[in-house]
Curated annotation (Swiss-Prot):
Organism this protein belongs to: Hahella chejuensis (strain KCTC 2396)
Keywords linked to the UniProt accession: Ribonucleoprotein, Ribosomal protein, RNA-binding, rRNA-binding
Biased composition regions of type Acidic residues, renumbered to the chain: 125-142
Family: Belongs to the bacterial ribosomal protein bS6 family.
Protein name: Small ribosomal subunit protein bS6
Amino acid sequence: MRHYEIVIMVHPDQSEQVPAMVERYTSSVNAGGGKVHRLEDWGRRHMAYPINKIHKAHYVLMNIECSQEVIDELMHNFRFNDAILRDLVIRRKDAVTEVSPIKAAESREQRAPRGEDRPARVVADDVDDSDDDTDDEDSNDE
């Protein structure tokens, strides 16, 4: 069996149906003897360019291991599902199980200190002004 990475972009009006879609696709992979190695719901994000005058989409990333018949069935389902704006299927050499950079960035943002917990900011007025480059003595030489 081969390893694949799949990213689907779902219409933002259909965001509440995403868990059911993902469940249907993962059960299809499991029924075909495959395995889901990674499943990440990136949520609603702004797209790089509009598709059919839509500027946001709900993103889902899956890394799976399955046979060619199962991936053909998935791609057929993606093509005829009107809720899916775009899909990308990439064949990988190995199973990818670590957290994606997008999800890692989101978790870093959630862990970052906010408000009162954040360290104090250095204000520019606190800097010593004694290293001023202007010489007051040279201006009187005229």
